Amino acid sequence: MADDMTQATEAPRNFTINFGPQHPAAHGVLRLVLELDGEVVERVDPHIGLLHRGTEKLLEHKTYLQGIGYFDRLDYVAPMNQEHAFCMAAEKLAGITVPKRGEYVRVLYCEIGRVLNHLLNVTTQAMDVGALTPPLWGFEEREKLMVFYERASGSRMHAHYFRPGGVHQDLPMKLVEDIRAWCDQFPAKLDDIDSLLTENRIFKQRNVDIGVVTKEDVLAWGFSGVMVRGSGLAWDLRRSQPYSVYDELKFDIPVGKNGDCYDRYLCRMEEMRESVKIMIQCCDWLMKDENAGEVLATDSKFSPPRRAEMKRSMEALIQHFKLYTEGVHVEEGETYVAVEAPKGEFGVYLVSDGSNKPYRLKIRAPGFAHLAAMDYMSKGHMLADVSAIIGSLDVVFGEIDR
């Protein structure tokens, strides 16, 4: 009996475990060092950098056109949204105006990217808490969207489709019609996923009141995107500082109120419906005959001359050769451009010294700030809740490690 009493007064020993980097719920190469008291999380220490490729430094040694490809490889779930930010920064420094049709094509593909991202996130978040059907249904729809990417750019993921001044090529009318037809059937598929998850008792038990962040926390940690809107702040760059043609489009901004994993899930589900509304408006605009025209600024130094012109004119041939070897010299200056990427505010800070390559390019990845708060959000939760919280943060290591 005496021995039992002495054991009871001993200090409890916490133990440390590694979560990842090969864990399926880590959403990439994330290593979390977890300190546990029994099954309660005391401390979370994210170890990042396992996918670091030195993107920002590599961009300093590439021309502006060559640099676009690196942005596809950041958040590789929705590549064109990142290209958009970089092209807008280059346009701002070079003083290029994008033709209206080019802007509508850009917005259409940015919203396809948003649906691609949210479909992956919502369905894998369900998989993290034990539901296997949603990913199978969601990936079927993602596959169709990947085909739209491929039909526009030739590639399913690393599109390299946006250019400073617009987009590389106009969309075939059949493709626009197919996207429009997809928009009509997709909400029913979304309802199917909705019916499986939203009122599901197990799904709610695993997500409600897990990983709560208040409005004050959101501002203090520098969150953006769904992480902000899930806590009740209607902050969306497409509405608060409109870029491209978002000010001409009608859409709502879904907002949560509790700031937990469940509200963030609901926000993403609703955002997909809003993205479909935007896609329908873009397709309808692009299909009108009076809106035909250029998709790439013809007066821009970034635009290559047409093939027919190159066969006739020596100057056009020289311009083409110079554009793809030396690249374009962009005026000296610096600028910051942010877009509302699916994960939050994706920003590009571009400094030009007047040469054909960026002098410095800083990438502001939204997931980086979200992962930084992992310790704060997980403290006091159970070990099983850690994967639910990571799932609702929506992290991709291409952009976090860069």
UniProtKB/Swiss-Prot annotation:
<keyword id="KW-1003">Cell membrane</keyword>
<dbReference type="InterPro" id="IPR029014">
    <property type="entry name" value="NiFe-Hase_large"/>
</dbReference>
<dbReference type="InterPro" id="IPR014029">
    <property type="entry name" value="NADH_UbQ_OxRdtase_49kDa_CS"/>
</dbReference>
<dbReference type="GO" id="GO:0050136">
    <property type="term" value="F:NADH:ubiquinone reductase (non-electrogenic) activity"/>
</dbReference>
<dbReference type="InterPro" id="IPR022885">
    <property type="entry name" value="NDH1_su_D/H"/>
</dbReference>
<comment type="similarity">
    <text>Belongs to the complex I 49 kDa subunit family.</text>
</comment>
<keyword id="KW-0813">Transport</keyword>
<keyword id="KW-0520">NAD</keyword>
<dbReference type="InterPro" id="IPR001135">
    <property type="entry name" value="NADH_Q_OxRdtase_suD"/>
</dbReference>
<comment type="function">
    <text>NDH-1 shuttles electrons from NADH, via FMN and iron-sulfur (Fe-S) centers, to quinones in the respiratory chain. The immediate electron acceptor for the enzyme in this species is believed to be ubiquinone. Couples the redox reaction to proton translocation (for every two electrons transferred, four hydrogen ions are translocated across the cytoplasmic membrane), and thus conserves the redox energy in a proton gradient.</text>
</comment>
<dbReference type="GO" id="GO:0005886">
    <property type="term" value="C:plasma membrane"/>
</dbReference>
<comment type="subunit">
    <text>NDH-1 is composed of 14 different subunits. Subunits NuoB, C, D, E, F, and G constitute the peripheral sector of the complex.</text>
</comment>
<keyword id="KW-0997">Cell inner membrane</keyword>
<dbReference type="Pfam" id="PF00346">
    <property type="entry name" value="Complex1_49kDa"/>
</dbReference>
<keyword id="KW-1278">Translocase</keyword>
<dbReference type="GO" id="GO:0051287">
    <property type="term" value="F:NAD binding"/>
</dbReference>
<protein>
    <recommendedName>
        <fullName>NADH-quinone oxidoreductase subunit D</fullName>
        <ecNumber>7.1.1.-</ecNumber>
    </recommendedName>
</protein>
<keyword id="KW-0472">Membrane</keyword>
<keyword id="KW-0874">Quinone</keyword>
<dbReference type="GO" id="GO:0048038">
    <property type="term" value="F:quinone binding"/>
</dbReference>
<keyword id="KW-0830">Ubiquinone</keyword>
